[in-house]
């Protein structure tokens, strides 16, 4: 049903939510805990995602924005939100329908993207990660190229091209076109 590592990730999620005395486990708690899961780490590395920045942003969000979930009574168990439950169910159903036996955290990462209105998806998109990137890696092993490197290359090409154009313009400013100086109606000597 679910892998041992995913089970450990879910336990970490519960502990993380409890550490803030939250009554519910949200997708943001789950995503934060998944950043320590080996299956998710492989995906994020392949997609060139800054895991530390993502983790820091999630932790900051949980601290500041989920204060309404605080329950001072320590005897209450932390419960998953409906969105949390849907994501886990979606991942398990998808894995079963594809003929595999166990869902792992990478499958859960794909399922998180179905909860479009969640802050977890927002933070993933802030890091320029989308569902297609994750699915491409999991299904075909296609790693996302570092778009920053591509951008730098395009910028360098543009800069070099502009330098060449400016150089040509400067040459035109200081030189004289002798073809324009010669009269056009004169015959060429034989």
Locate each region found by the language model.
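Histone-fold recognition with a strong bias for associated Lys/Arg-rich disordered tails
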Residues: 1-190
């Amino acid at each position: 049903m679910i892998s041992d590592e995913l089970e450990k990730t879910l336990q970490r999620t519960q502990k993380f939510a409890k550490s803030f005395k939250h009554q519910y486990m949200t997708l943001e708690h789950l995503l934060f805990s998944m950043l320590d899961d080996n299956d998710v780490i492989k995906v994020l590395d392949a997609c060139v995602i800054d895991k530390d920045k993502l983790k820091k942003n999630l932790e900051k969000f949980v601290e500041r924005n989920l204060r309404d979930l605080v329950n001072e009574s320590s005897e209450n168990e932390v419960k998953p939100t409906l969105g949390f439950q849907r994501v886990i169910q979606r991942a398990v159903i998808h894995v079963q329908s594809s003929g595999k036996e166990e869902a792992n955290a990478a499958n859960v990462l794909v399922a998180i993207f179905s909860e479009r209105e969640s802050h977890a998806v927002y933070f993933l998109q802030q890091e320029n990660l989308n569902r297609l990137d994750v699915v491409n890696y999991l299904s075909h092993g296609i790693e996302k190229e570092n778009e920053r490197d591509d951008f730098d290359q395009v910028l360098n090409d543009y800069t070099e091209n502009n330098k060449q154009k400016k150089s040509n313009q400067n040459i035109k400013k200081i030189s004289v076109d002798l073809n324009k100086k010669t009269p056009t109606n004169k015959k060429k000597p034989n």
